[in-house]
Each structure stands twice: as C-alpha cells, then as structure tokens.
UniProtKB/Swiss-Prot annotation:
It comes from Dictyostelium discoideum (Social amoeba). This is Gelsolin-related protein of 125 kDa. It is found in: Cytoplasmic vesicle. The gene is gnrA. Residues 562-586, 901-910 have a biased composition (Acidic residues). Residues 550-598, 710-912 form a coiled coil.
Length: 1087
C-alpha cells in the first residue's frame, strides 16, 4: 500500500508536502515463474497474487484456490498461480475481480465440484464480480484462465499430475497422507506490556465460540495464516501481530514447495463481523450473527391497513437535498486538496493523483478526496473526506481505505492538532454540489484508460460521462432530447450534438469537453442541434432522426389570437403592412396551435418498501441506477408519465401495492400535469430506451438466465467448427497468394541475376587487362632496382677509407629501397587482391618470392667480398700489433700488478660471455656495428682502437669477422628475459632510419637474453684460433670503469673466458613437469 503523508501545520495555507511510505504486501506472482513474495509489511493483502495485465482485461489480485480432500469437509487452500500445482483429482477456483473460473477434470468427485461452485458463488458476491461463475473442463479453458497461469498463447493446457502432492506424508507410513490441521493462537498484551501467545486447544477442533471481540487471534492453517482482529483490540496489540505471525510460521514444518520456491507466508487480515468465506470454511460450523429485526411487531393484516393510511400527499412535497457545510470560504482558495485513487482490487494500494488530473475520474476505481482548510474567522484546522465510488469499482476498496489510508490521514490530522476528518461516502452520478466545487464547475468520468479510438460522452448538468455502449448499438439510439452528446474521433473531428431542451451550461461543457483530454485528442469541433443534422452527421453516427429518444413532453394549448390595430405615425410603411395582416386575421377568424417541447419540471424517484412495517414510498434525491433494488418496486415520475419499475426478485404483493400507490399519486397531483398521464410498467432487464434515458450513463447489466450446458456445448462446438472452416479457407487463400508472390519474386530474381552476370563478365575483362599492365610495370621496376643495387654495391666496395661505414649505408639504402618496393608491391597487391581472382594472387606471390631470393643472393655475394677484404686487413693488423707488444713489455708488467690487485675485487663477480646466435636476415646490418663504452658514445671501430693502443672490448662476432663480446653481471642462475630476440630485432630495425644519426651501439647486448643458451658460431671459432689478444689488458682497463660507472651494463671479472660455455636453462618440458608435480602435491595436501 502506498500511503501519502500529509502536511506540516506551518504550510497549510500555502502548499502541503506529501511524503510516501511503502508497505509491501506478501503475495506471490500469478505467472509461471513464481516470483518471490515480499517479506516486510504492516498490512498484508488479502489476495495471493499481484496485478495481472492481460490483452483481454485486467485481473486484480488473481489467485488460485485448490479444493482438495477425500471426504467432506473439503479444504480450500490458496496455492501459487502455476500449472505445476494443477492435478486431475482436485477442483480449482481462479478468482479475480473480472472473472471467476472453476476448473476440474472428469476424475474429480461430484461433491467436490458442487462445493467448489458453491464457494465460487460466495466469492463472487464477496468481491463484487460482475460476471457469472464459469465452469471449465480440460480442453475448454478460457483464454484468460490460461493467461493467468502463464500458458503461452496458442498452446493447450497439459496436466499430467493425477493426485495432490501438497500435503505432508506420514513419517511412519509413507503411503498415508496427512491432511492439514488448524491451530488457533490468542494474542494479548501481558502485564509487562509485551505480547503473549496462548494456544487454544480443544478435542473437537476449533470453533467460532473461541473468538473473542476483545482479543486478536492467529489461525495457522499450515499452508496459510489468518489474523482475526476483534472490535475492542488495542492499537498496541495490532502493531505486533505481523512479527508474531511470522515467528509462528518459522517454528513449525511447512509444505515442501514453500522451501523449493522460497515463498513467503500468506497472511490475510480478517475483521470481526466482516469475515471472508474462506476464513469461515476453516471452522467446522460457522453461525451468522443474528441481524436486527427489520419488520414491525404488527401483523400482515395491520400492514395493509397502515399502508392505506399512508399519506400520499407527502410524495408531492420536494425532498430537500442535505447540504454539506464545509465551513470554508466560498472559493475554496484557502485550503489544500489531496486526492488518491485505488490501485488494486483489494483497496490496500492507493496512488496519489496529480493536480493536473483533478476532476477526472474512472468509473472502475474509487477515489479519496481529502480537503484541508481553515474555517472563516478561526485559527483551527479542519478537514473533510469524500469517498467517491465508480459504477464499476470494487466494494472492498472502502474496507481497505478504512483500515489503511484513513488511519494514516487520522494520524497526520492529530499531529496538526485537528479533529478527525468528517467523511462523506458518495457514488457516481450522485455527487453533491459541494464535492463538485472542489474541482471547479465540471467533472469528467471515464470508463477505461485513454486510447486513440472513438469515444462517446454524455453531458448532463455539470458532469460529462463516457458511455460504455454495446458495439452493435452505437448509433442514434443513444441520443435523447434532455442531454448533449460528444462524439470524439482523435486527430479527425469532434461532433457535438445538443438535444432540444438541453441547457446552456450543458452546451458549453460539451463544446469544451475535449480540453480535459491530452492535446492529441484535439480536432475541429462541429456542433449540431436536434432537428438540424446534416446527411454527413447520420453517415458518421448511424441511424436517423426517428431513433432519437424524445424524453420531453409536448404542451398543446389552442388559443384564438386577436391582435389590436395600432397606428404608428413615425413609420408609415410598417403600419400599412401590419394593418393588412390584422384585417386578414379578423376576416378569417384563424385559430393557431402552438406545439412546444418542454423539459420535465421535476423528475422524482420513489423507492417503495415495507421494511419499516408500513408500505410507503421514500423519495431518493439525487437518484441513479444504483438505487434500483431488485427486491423492491420503484416509481419514476417524469411529470407527463409515471414508470413503475419491478425488480426481478420483487413479489406480486409489492407490485399490486405499488400500482395502487401510483394511481393515488396521479389523482392527488395538483401540478397541472397532462390529463393523459398514465402508469407504465417496466420490468428489470427489459427496460425501454425512454426509461433508461432519464438515468445518467445507464450501465448495461445482462440478466441472469440459466443456460443448459449441453446446449451451450453444442453451440460452442458448432461455432468452433465454423471457425475452423473459415480458417482453412483463409489459409488456402493465403497459400495461393503466397505462391503467386513467390513466382513473381523468383522471376524478378532470375532477371536480376542475368543482368549481374553480364556486368561481372565485363568487369572481369577490364580487371584482366589492368592486371596485365600492372605485371609489366612491376617487372620493369624490379629490373631497374636490381641494376641500381649492383652498381651502388660495386662503387661502395672500391672505397677503402670508408669501407665499414659505406657498407652500412649501402645496406641501409638497399633496405629502404626494398621497403619502399615492398610497400609499393603490397599496395598494388592489395588493389589486385580486391579485384583479381584467387589464382592470379597466387602467381603474384610466387613471383615476389623469386625477386626476394635474387636480392638475397646479391646481398650474400657483397657480404662475402667484404668479409674476405676484412680478413686480410685484420691479419696484417695483428702482425703489426705483435711487434708493438714486444716493445711495450715494460708497460704490461705494470698492468699485471694492477690486475693482481683487481683479482681480489672481481672474485665475487663472474662474467658470462654471450655469443649471439647466427643472426637472421633482418639483423645483419645491426650485427656489424660495434659496442660503445659507457664513457665514449661515439662510434669507434676496432681498427682505430688497436692503433691507439687502447684495450679492445670484444662483444660478439659480426659478419665481417670482428669479435664483439657482451658482458653482463652474473646474478646466479640464468633467468629468462621478458623480451624475445625477435622483439629486439624489430626495435633495432626501426632505430636505423635513412635520415637518423648512425650511433654504433652494441644491439646484441639488449637482443640476447641471459637465459638463452649460447650457441657457438663457426666463424667465431675460426677467428679465435687465428687471433691473439691479452685478456689482462682488457680486465685492467675495463674493470675499474665498471666499478666507477654503476650505471654501465658491462662488468668484468678475472675468471677465464670460455667461448663454448653455456647456461643450462630449464626447458618447457621440465617446467610442465614441475607444474604437474606441484598440482598433485597441492591436491594431496588439500586432501
């Protein structure tokens, strides 16, 4: 239930702040998914399920009741709304505000079926359902019944469960089923102020006498619970009932499906004197409380005598309408109006209405209008509540309001130091003027939610009401001479029709009625008066002028009119014309008859009853269709005629007495009514259109007639067969149409394919020519490239001074040109690939590979020539160095001393020689560069170092034969680096652009990870055998530099250098083995 807090006392004069509090109810969803119920809540809904919206209608609080048990008394248990709970043994009742179904199979017991129908009839009266109870069998389910159960549209209901399985099984004997037992607990407040529980036990079970009006009781039915509130229960006790009920629910065993579906307990409120029929069925015997005697102590004979003594003349006196004195200002500007509308069938949910929607009501809902005001010349705060009920609203809304929203309003008014609000309960079409003044001057009543479809409104007095006519009878028969009618066609036109005796206020309201609706309903307005309709009007509305209900009376007065002659001096011409007309009238002695339609002076309704022991007629003012009691007779006086309406359950004696009373009423009338005034008999369900026209927005209620089920079954079967035939014919027609359409489409597709094939052939020929031209151009470009590379290489080899630099530059230029060629080839390949076929692409790839192999061969020839030249130069340089070393023996001795001192320092550091593996094609240019020391970042060749008598730092063996050593600090076992050799090569390739400076750094240091195994190169072994160098000089010069420069990546030690030494790193297989052993050991430890 949504409850709206009202106001603070400081803001009454200006605005009222509303605060909403939510109190969820415990109710499972009716769909097959069985949503979880809400747990918390101070007020629990009486129904088991939430709102179910259907394309057919709205079903509020739909719930499923299972009628089960072997023998009488049968059990009525509320179960979740799902197909899973249906079985062939029991009978099920589906209850909603719109429908009540009784579903059963052929296996169900006859007594059980009868009890289920009897309970369904009681539920229908209790909830105010308008439709009759429908008994369904397997295979004949109503679409709404299937929808509420969650059965998909178009599928049939399939129930295979034969027996009931919601009852618990006896632990000792599993074949024996335990039927549910009922336990009654008395809840009262103890001396300590805390709630106390007292079980009510009797050998014969629970009975009605256990319930006391001064206490509260909780009835535990194993599958559901009821809270019974006595009339004299204190407020403090009520607040503790829900927690106590939940505690009792958790202490005892419940059916298994509650645990599987995680459902919350079904708790229902029951009030003393207003017990539901399901609650009464839990008791072995329930006796209705005796109603007060409504008959007098007089005998029937005395009734007749006193009936004759009834003063009929009192019926001619007008009954005053009771005036509601609100006490506020006449303009209602100093107050605050709050409006709520019912949001559910049980009346526990109330939704706030926005101010823009004030004055618009729905006939299927109830409204609570709370007006807070300050009386004139007073400082106190007062309030009044109008409870408005629509014609199609649920009567239980008022009960839910009294025990829910009214309590909240009462609390807020107490906080404002105000008395309880004065309450008025009014029904549709019987609104007092004070109620209408709260919303202005007019009201609008709708029967259904707004939709862009034609609507008809009847305007009478200051109310506009949407009609709910039969679709087949929507024509001029709805019109009458007393009222105005509005035919609204959204986005097209609005037709307003006025009766002959409709008032000016009605005409204004009818013309402006569309202003109450959203802007999309606006259209051009065309007004018509009765008797002045056009042909287009009858085409749109239907019918003709003879179908209009003439509910006026005609006053015919024959008078001889003699006009006196009057001479006018100022206007001679007018005087002559008037004299001629007067002379003609005198000569002919003409008599004129004036016929005029008049509105009935007063329309009165009298209810004729003998409840007080005296047969009399009580006037009802204002009156509506609701006042027509089927057990009584009613007199309707329309001045020129008196209707006698007989209820379907009224007796013949009441009819005779009412007829006598009607005759006396006409005879004693002194209001100059027509002399031919008579009494017309009207029976319930057979009312004439003239009788209905005097009631505002007549509600169509079909009579309750017994229908033979066999006849109805035959009619349904015939209708079903007829529908099947029609469906088959429609299917055949559709199939024929589809086949024709498919043939047309196929012909179109064939023509389109032919055109596409022709276009593709032309495109392929063009593509082939373009491909051939591109191939010729590529061959020419490749030949030119080959010649240029050969010439450039020969020129670079001849230069002796800059051999190494020029070779590098040539290789870089060759690479750049290759890259450019590759880019061009790739661009052309992409264009050719997108256009040419797969076979042509393969041929181009083969040709590209041949070109690359030729370029590789040229490179290898150039490299071999360069290697041979360098080897000769190195041999000559080595010879010269041996001579220089002999002259410098003295210097070497000093160096040896320094080495001995450094050996002690370098014992802890070990140097690993990393010999790079045979470099790939991409690394050939990088391997030829030498490593620069940390101090000297410029590019210095090996030859220059030897000439300058500086120690040489070998890193690795390049392709030219130089030794290039990479020294890395030794930190224990080798560890795999995160960078792979391929990544280093890609980075080194990018660093040598054409326009970038050539810094000769040793890329092999970064490229070769320490953890990778060292593979000795054949060229390295040959060069080491042919060369000789002093390791001590290397250690003496470089070890100090490494110690000084902490940031240098090179470190040295006195350990011997072994070119063939390798680091054994764990292989992938060993890693996998280790991981598997770890997993097993871990699993064992866990086990």
């Amino acid at each position: 239930m949504e409850e709206d807090n009202i106001v603070d006392s400081k803001e009454i004069e200006n605005n009222v702040e509303d605060k909403k509090e939510e109190t969820p109810s415990s109710s499972p969803s009716p769909s097959s998914s069985l949503q979880q119920q809400q747990e918390e809540g101070g007020v629990v809904k009486q129904a088991v399920s939430n709102l179910v919206s259907s394309s057919i209608t709205l079903h509020d609080d739909a719930k499923l009741i299972q009628v089960t048990g072997k023998d009488e008394p049968f059990h009525f248990i509320s179960v979740p709304m799902s197909v899973e709970f249906l079985n062939l043994e029991d009978v099920f009742i589906m209850q909603s505000d719109a429908y009540i179904f009784v579903w059963c199979s052929e296996q169900a017991n006859i007594k059980k079926k009868a009890k289920a129908v009897q309970m369904a009839q009681k539920l229908k009266v209790e909830i105010g359902c308008q439709r009759a109870v429908q008994v369904l069998e397997i295979g004949e389910e109503h679409p709404t019944f299937l929808f509420c159960l969650g059965v998909p549209k178009g599928t049939k209901l399939n129930v295979t469960k034969e027996k009931n399985d919601i009852f618990q099984v006896d632990e000792d004997d599993e074949e024996q089923v335990l039927e549910p037992e009922f336990f009654l607990f008395k809840i009262f407040t103890g001396t300590d102020g805390k709630p106390s529980i007292k079980p009510m036990e009797e050998d014969e079970g629970i009975n009605q006498e256990m319930l006391e009006s001064s206490a509260c009781f909780i009835l535990d039915c194993e599958h559901e619970m009821y809270i019974w509130l006595g009339k004299g229960v204190k407020k403090s006790t009520k607040d503790t009932l829900i927690p106590v009920a939940k505690k009792i629910w958790t202490q005892y065993d419940r059916p298994e499906y509650y645990g599987k579906l995680k459902l919350q307990p079904i708790i229902t409120w029951v009030f003393d004197g207003a017990e539901s029929c399901l609650f009464k069925s839990k008791f072995s015997k329930w006796v209705e409380k005796a109603q007060p005697l409504q008959t007098s102590y007089l005998s029937l004979s005395s009734k007749k005598k006193e009936a004759l003594n009834f003063d009929v003349s009192s019926m001619h006196q007008d009954k005053e309408v009771p005036v509601i004195n609100i006490g506020a200002a006449s303009d209602y500007s100093n107050g605050k109006l709050l409006v709520w509308c019912s949001g559910g069938g049980s009346g526990n949910k109330w939704n706030k209405v926005e101010e823009d929607d004030f004055g618009i009501f729905y006939s299927n809902k109830s409204y609570v209008c709370h007006f807070i005001y300050k009386p004139e010349n007073k400082n106190s705060i007062r309030s009044v509540i109008f409870f408005w009920e629509g014609l199609y609203s649920n009567q239980r809304n008022y009960i839910g309001y009294k025990f829910g929203l009214y309590k909240e309003i009462q609390k807020k008014m107490e906080g404002l130091k105000s008395d309880d609000p004065v309450e008025y309960r009014i029904s549709q079409n019987k609104e007092p003027q004070e109620f209408i003044n709260l919303f202005g001057t007019e009201l609008l009543v709708l029967n259904e939610e707004l939709a862009l479809k034609p609507m008809i409104f009847q305007v009478r007095a200051n109310r506009g009401t949407q009609l709910f006519p039969d679709p087949d009878s929507c024509n001029a028969k709805l019109l009458n001479s007393l009222d105005s009618f509005v035919f609204l066609f959204p986005n097209k036109y609005i037709i307003v029709w006025h009766g002959k005796v409709s008032t000016e206020h009605q005409r204004e309201l009818a013309a402006d009625l569309f202003t109450f609706l959203p802007p999309e309903y606006e259209a051009g307005v065309k007004e018509f008066d009765q008797g002045k309709e056009s042909d287009n009007f009858w085409k749109i509305i239907g019918g003709n002028s003879n179908d209009i209900v003439i509910n006026t009376f005609i006053n015919e007065n024959k008078e001889e009119k003699e006009k006196e002659e009057e001479e006018k001096e100022e206007e001679e011409e007018e005087e002559e014309e008037e004299e001629e007309e007067e002379e003609e009238e005198k000569d002919n002695n003409k008599t004129t008859t004036i016929i005029k339609h008049l509105r009935p002076k007063k329309i009165k309704l009298f209810l004729c009853t003998d409840n007080s022991g005296i047969f009399k007629a009580d006037q009802i003012n204002p009156f509506s269709q609701v006042d027509l009691n089927s057990q009584e007779c009613v007199l309707l006086d329309v001045y020129h005629k008196v209707f006698l309406w007989k209820g379907s359950k009224s007796t013949d004696q009441k009819l005779n007495d009412t007829q006598d009373l009607a005759k006396q009423y006409i005879e004693t009338a002194n209001d100059q009514r027509p002399s031919d005034c008579s009494v017309e008999l009207v029976e319930q369900y057979n009312e004439s259109p003239l009788f209905k026209s005097y009631f505002h927005s007549w509600k169509v209620t079909p009579p309750k007639v017994f229908i033979d089920p066999i006849i109805s079954y035959k009619q349904k079967l015939a209708e079903r067969l007829q529908k099947e035939k029609e469906d088959l014919e429609k299917l055949k027609q559709q199939q024929e149409q589809e086949q024709e359409q498919q043939q047309k489409e196929n012909n179109k597709i064939v023509e389109e394919v032919k055109e596409e094939v022709k276009e593709e052939d032309v495109k392929e020929e063009v593509k082939e020519e373009e491909v051939k031209e591109e191939e010729v151009k590529e061959e020419e470009v490749k030949e030119v490239a080959k010649e240029e590379t050969k010439e450039e290489i020969k020129e670079e080899v001849n230069d002796e001074a800059t051999e190494v630099k020029e070779v590098n530059q040539v290789e870089e230029e060759v690479k750049e040109e290759e890259v450019k060629e590759e880019v061009k080839v790739e661009v052309k390949e992409e264009e050719v690939k997108g256009e040419a076929k797969e076979e042509e692409v393969k041929e181009e790839e083969v040709k590209e590979e041949e070109v690359k192999e030729e370029v590789k061969e040229v490179k290898e020839e150039v490299k071999e020539e360069v290697k041979q030249d360098k080897e000769e130069e190195v041999n000559e340089e080595i010879k010269e160095e041996t001579k220089e070393e002999e002259t410098k023996e003295d210097d070497n001795k000093e160096d040896e001393k320094v080495n001995e001192e450094n050996e002690t320092v370098n014992e802890e550091n070990e140097v690993g020689i990393i010999v790079s593996p045979p470099s790939e094609k991409v690394d050939e240019a990088n391997s030829s560069s030498t490593i620069s020391s940390p101090e000297n970042e410029g590019s210095v060749s090996v030859k220059d170092k030897r000439k300058s008598n500086e120690p040489i730092t070998p890193s690795v063996v390049s392709s030219s034969g130089d030794l290039l050593f990479a020294y890395e600090p030794y930190h224990g076992p080798p560890i795999h680096s995160s960078n792979s050799p391929k990544q280093g090569r890609k980075g080194g390739r990018k660093s040598h652009g054409k326009n970038q400076p050539q810094h000769k750094k040793n890329h092999s240091v970064d490229q070769s990870p320490l953890s990778s195994p060292i593979i000795p190169n054949k060229s390295l072994n040959l060069d080491i055998d042919n060369q000789s160098f002093d390791l001590n000089s290397i250690n003496n010069n470089n070890s100090v530099e490494v110690l000084d420069g902490a940031s240098s990546p090179l470190s040295f030690s006195s350990s011997s250098i072994n070119s063939n030494s390798t680091h054994n790193t764990p292989s992938k297989k060993n890693k996998n083995k280790n991981k598997k052993k770890h997993n097993r050991s871990s699993s064992l430890t866990h086990a």
